[in-house]
């Protein structure tokens, strides 16, 4: 009978003072309110080791994502396709795109990333994996639990009577009319997958779909309310905790948050309460092994002139353009130059238990998460987004017609929706 083991790892990825935050689009690091972490688990005993990692950064794009994944794969003695790296997406944190930073340096634009700091984070995270493997503990059970989160998530896109976006409800929304509007389409549930050695909990992995910011732009580095809820839970239980962002591309706390400083603690406690409730509701099941499967997807680029390399190059090389616009142009060019490299969409299925974890790239809209659940109504579907963030937002095709913020910066074409849903359905299918 197979024997399964679980290793846990973590490393500090807090940037030094002065480091750009959110890709250089906001105030750089002026202080640290709480440290940033890269946290992960390694599942051992299957075909190949599987690595799941969550980083308290805004994002990892293109080559930055691939470098991080490759390093963890080598450390865990597996292949990159069996490694899933995701970002929690708080904004007072680094945003890494190695190729974009090289373009920025060549154009003598303000930096978006310290490449030496990034390489050091990758190296130390891989070292943490290597050090964790000898400490792996036997794993006998997997658990699942679900709890409703009260008064955190709301849809960012508030539509008017004409079907167009009337209000963009950002993470900190001060407009009383926008805040008074209904929550809109969200997934109100936090989901928890846990690993056990008989009655001893080894790790708890949580996911919830929402931008995790209470306030940002002040240069104060923080994992913000979702990371703080995770750490509060770890301190009170002594159990290793991870938090993943679900398909929160069009979801924020804007209905319940005006950016007041005290709201960070309030939102933290609401997420924490759901973590506690999901843990209490956990149902443990014997572990019969797992299957890891993945499919490649080649994303199609936007065709509008503003998204072309030629137009992006003009902005990048314009010394009079704002730093945020120049950096964004570099991100667009880096994306166009990697289109020949597909992105793997992954699924982890725990055999004979109807438990599936779906791992997606980018800032996927909540519609993808809800669609995945409808595809497998017989199963517990744990959806994680914010993997390779090269394409940025992944809206629905309809969203491009409705307007709003996300379609103005999404780098993949509207037909992405059909392509991605097709891949998700194949991965989640019992017949696969």
List the model feature ranges, each with a label.
Residues 1-240, 246-251, 256-266, 279, ...:
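Conserved beta-alpha junction segments in alpha/beta enzyme cores
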Residues 271:
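Anionic-ligand-binding alpha/beta catalytic cores of soluble enzymes and soluble regulatory domains
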């Amino acid at each position: 009978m197979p024997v399964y083991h679980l290793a846990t790892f973590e490393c500090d990825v807090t940037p030094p003072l002065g480091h750009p935050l959110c890709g250089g689009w906001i105030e750089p690091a002026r202080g640290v309110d709480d440290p940033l972490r890269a946290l992960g688990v390694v599942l051992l005993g299957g075909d190949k080791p599987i690595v799941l990692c969550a980083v308290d950064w805004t994002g990892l794009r293109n080559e930055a994502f691939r470098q991080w994944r490759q390093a963890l794969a080598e450390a865990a003695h597996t292949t990159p396709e069996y490694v899933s790296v995701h970002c929690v997406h708080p904004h007072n944190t680094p945003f890494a795109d190695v190729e974009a930073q090289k373009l920025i340096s060549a154009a003598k634009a303000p930096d978006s990333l310290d490449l030496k700091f990034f390489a050091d984070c990758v190296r130390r995270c891989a070292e943490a994996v290597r050090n964790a493997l000898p400490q792996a503990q036997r794993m006998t059970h997997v658990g699942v639990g679900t709890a409703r989160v009260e008064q955190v998530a709301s849809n960012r896109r508030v539509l008017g009577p004409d079907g167009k976006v009337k209000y963009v409800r950002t993470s900190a929304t001060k407009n009383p009319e926008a805040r008074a509007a209904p929550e809109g389409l969200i997934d109100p549930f936090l989901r928890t997958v846990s690993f056990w050695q008989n009655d001893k909990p080894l790790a708890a992995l949580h996911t919830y779909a929402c931008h995790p910011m209470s306030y940002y732009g002040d240069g104060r580095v923080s994992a913000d309310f979702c990371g703080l809820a995770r750490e509060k839970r770890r301190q009170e239980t002594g159990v290793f905790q991870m938090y993943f962002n679900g398909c929160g591309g069009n979801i924020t706390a804007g209905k319940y948050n005006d950016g007041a400083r005290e709201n960070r603690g309030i939102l933290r406690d609401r997420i924490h309460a759901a973590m506690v409730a999901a843990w209490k509701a956990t149902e443990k099941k014997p572990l019969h092994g797992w299957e890891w499967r993945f499919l490649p997807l080649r994303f199609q680029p936007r065709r509008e002139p503003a998204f072309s390399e030629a137009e992006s190059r003009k902005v990048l090389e314009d010394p009079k353009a704002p730093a945020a616009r120049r950096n964004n142009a570099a991100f667009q060019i880096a994306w166009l130059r990697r289109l020949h490299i597909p992105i793997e969409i992954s699924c982890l299925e725990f055999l004979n238990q109807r438990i599936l974890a779906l791992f997606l790239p980018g800032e996927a809209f909540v519609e993808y998460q809800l669609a995945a659940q409808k595809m497998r109504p017989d199963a517990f579907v744990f959806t994680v987004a914010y993997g390779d963030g090269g394409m940025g937002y992944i809206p629905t095709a309809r969203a491009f017609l409705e307007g709003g913020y996300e379609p103005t910066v999404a780098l993949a074409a509207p037909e992405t929706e059909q392509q991605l849903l097709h891949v998700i359905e194949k991965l989640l299918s019992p017949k696969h």
